[in-house]
Amino acid sequence: MKQLGKHIILELWGCENQALDDQPGIEKMLVDAVKACGATLICVKTHKFSPQGVTGVAVLSESHISIHTWPELRYAAMDVFTCGEHVTPHDTIPEIQKFLKPEKIDVMDIKRGIIEVDEVKE
């Protein structure tokens, strides 16, 4: 069996309100998370909502990291999806924790693109 991608979904509860509404800080966190997992950054795009909240995505050569925040609930939802053997999505978590300071994190692991090895055309 071969796995084409590794995908983690993060549920981040009890985060710092100010961090969840800090668009430049979230952009920096995304860049730091990309570096931490060994991925290749293509670009970062974020949007600040009124009155609060930020959504953002780091587009990677290997896929993406995304975030959507609810400061009023102290909650953030994140996806880290990577392809390739050299990238480790779980390595993003310390950078995310350092910035958002969640009280609780739920991590769901998804193996993407499971195929039989003999199906892979080299």
Swiss-Prot record:
It comes from Methanococcus maripaludis (strain C5 / ATCC BAA-1333). Is synthesized initially as an inactive proenzyme. Formation of the active enzyme involves a self-maturation process in which the active site pyruvoyl group is generated from an internal serine residue via an autocatalytic post-translational modification. Two non-identical subunits are generated from the proenzyme in this reaction, and the pyruvate is formed at the N-terminus of the alpha chain, which is derived from the carboxyl end of the proenzyme. Belongs to the prokaryotic AdoMetDC family. Type 1 subfamily. The lineage of its organism: Archaea, Methanobacteriati, Methanobacteriota, Methanomada group, Methanococci. This is S-adenosylmethionine decarboxylase proenzyme. It holds the Pfam family AdoMet_dc. Binds 1 pyruvoyl group covalently per subunit. Gene3D superfamilies: 3.30.160.750, S-adenosylmethionine decarboxylase domain. SUPFAM superfamilies: S-adenosylmethionine decarboxylase. Coiled coil: none annotated. Heterotetramer of two alpha and two beta chains arranged as a dimer of alpha/beta heterodimers. Its EC number is 4.1.1.50. Its cofactor is pyruvate. GO terms for cellular component: cytosol. The gene is speH. The keyword Transmembrane does not apply. The modification Pyruvic acid (Ser) is found at S63.
